[in-house]
Amino acid sequence: MQATKTGNASTVFVVDDEASVRDSLTWLLNSISLDVRTFESAKDFLDADISCTHGCVVLDVRMQNVSGLQLQQALSERGFKLPIIFLSAYGDAQMGAQAVKKGAFDFLQKPYRNQDLLDAVNAALALNREMADKQNEKQKHLDLLATLSQREMEILDKVVAGSSSKEIAKLLGISYKTVEAHRGRIISKLGLKSTGDLMHFVMRGSSHCSDCGRQPLPGSSPCRPAA
């Protein structure tokens, strides 16, 4: 494995068993100030400590022992999230379709134009940054929600489900004023100003439950039983 540092926050991981290809890709990517780490085999890449969360992978399809497609599958099973750009000298349309179907970002045929590769890498890095921003936003939601008490979470869940303060008070066996006090503290802890802001906050950090169609709170189980 070889690494070249330019100070860029993103890293392009190049996996190709041809030294000339690795060298040319390193030169090309360094020319636009991208950090590069190269590997001559899928095994070397799998054995490496890839802790970087910002970047993409440029991967040769046909390599000895473990092919690019097999490496893609292994990375998928490990939960590896960086976008993958495949390079192939064989122009196999079916193989390209298979790779993209399994989540590859792009598939380029050798010999490729330098600009085509740079465009693909820049697009992959932009996608990775977008994914990272969304993950960071989700984590911020979770961190804020973690400041709420169990009772506040119960009330928030019911507010999001559309229950009024009077309905929540009846469901939980507490007074209307207590519900309103909890609602105010929830809004304050989350750094919001209104119930409308509260609904928007939850919707931005949630996804629909595949079982019941409800939109659960971030970090909660999809179908939480009523308290």
UniProtKB/Swiss-Prot annotation:
The keyword DNA-binding applies. Signal peptide: none annotated. The modification 4-aspartylphosphate is found at D60. Residues 141-206 form the HTH luxR-type domain. GO terms for biological process: phosphorelay signal transduction system; regulation of DNA-templated transcription. CDD domains: LuxR_C_like, REC_FixJ. InterPro entries: CheY-like_superfamily (IPR011006), Sig_transdc_resp-reg_C-effctor (IPR016032), Sig_transdc_resp-reg_receiver (IPR001789), Tscrpt_reg_LuxR_C (IPR000792), WH-like_DNA-bd_sf (IPR036388). Residues 165-184 bind DNA. GO terms for molecular function: DNA binding. Phosphorylated by TdiS. The keyword Phosphoprotein applies. It holds the Pfam family GerE. Disulfide bonds: none annotated. PANTHER family: DNA-BINDING TRANSCRIPTIONAL ACTIVATOR DEVR_DOSR. This is Transcriptional regulatory protein TdiR.
